[in-house]
Structure formats: structure tokens, C-alpha cells
């Protein structure tokens, strides 16, 4: 099980402050305090399918339930900040408006987060946080039926 092998389990998720596509300022994990939250993080456009594979099933199962939250966090190097309006505009056009509040694009020092979480930026990553922002599950790349079951089971246990 992930709890036995992953050093991130039990750690507080590092703070990310950024603007959502709905143009609200969000600070993760604080913006979701009191909720069980899936945070899906990607550093490459090519990882989008991986995030969708985690977020889609989670949102389908928990998205309308009270006490749950989810965020998709594209992490973009500060060097692309000058393209922010074009990048965010493209994402807004391609993502349904009701999902905009859940997409929080961070422009900045991405290496800070890859080091803090000891993750490989070539993959998308899914972090399930408890109500206090502590990491209780972590997945990388595409999920399989077993990892989705573990994610769901962990979320349901946290909800009790």
C-alpha cells in the first residue's frame, strides 16, 4: 500500500497560491480546508491525459458530494509568465465554465514543488488530501483499477 512506501504520505501538501481560470485567488491546501481534496498536478501538456484519468473518476464519484473538493494544477515555469493570458485563455476556451474554479494555474518556480514532493515532472501526479491538507494518497502517471480503488477507499475512509 502507498502508506508504507511513499514518504509524502502524512506530510502537509506544500502551499500553492495562484489564480483559477474563474479568476479567483486560491491557496491550496487552505482554500479546501475542511474538505477531502484531490489535487492533480502536471508540469507538461503531455500529462493532461494522466490528470483527466484521475480527476474524471474522482469527480464522477465524489464531485457532487458535500465535503469533497478537487483541483487541477498546471505548473508552468515562470519563464512562460509573459504568455499567461494566452495560455489561460486557451485553457478557458477548452474547459467547461463550471470547471474553471477547479483549474488553478501556477506560474513560478516549479522546481520548488518537484523537490518538496520528490516527484518526477515527466508525469502527472494525484494527491488526496485530508481535511487538514495532509497527503493521504499519491498516484503517478495513469491510474489502473487497483490505484483508483485505493484512491476511492482512502477518500471514503477520510469521509467517515
Where do the model's predicted regions map?
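A short beta-strand-turn-helix
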Residues: 16-36
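Loop/turn elements at helix/coil->beta-strand transitions in domains of secreted/extracellular proteins
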Residues: 34-36, 66-69, 124, 131-132
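N-proximal helix/coil linker or "cap" segments that precede and/or mark the start of modular domains
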Residues: 1-14
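Structural cue for short, hydrophobic secondary-structure segments
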Residues: 38-42, 72
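Structural microenvironment flanking redox-active thiols in thiol-disulfide oxidoreductases
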Residues: 46-96
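Solvent-exposed loop/turn segments at secondary-structure junctions
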Residues: 45-47, 76-80, 110, 135, ...
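Thioredoxin-like thiol-disulfide oxidoreductase module
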Residues: 79-122
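Thiol-/selenol-based redox modules, centered on thioredoxin-like
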Residues: 115, 121-160
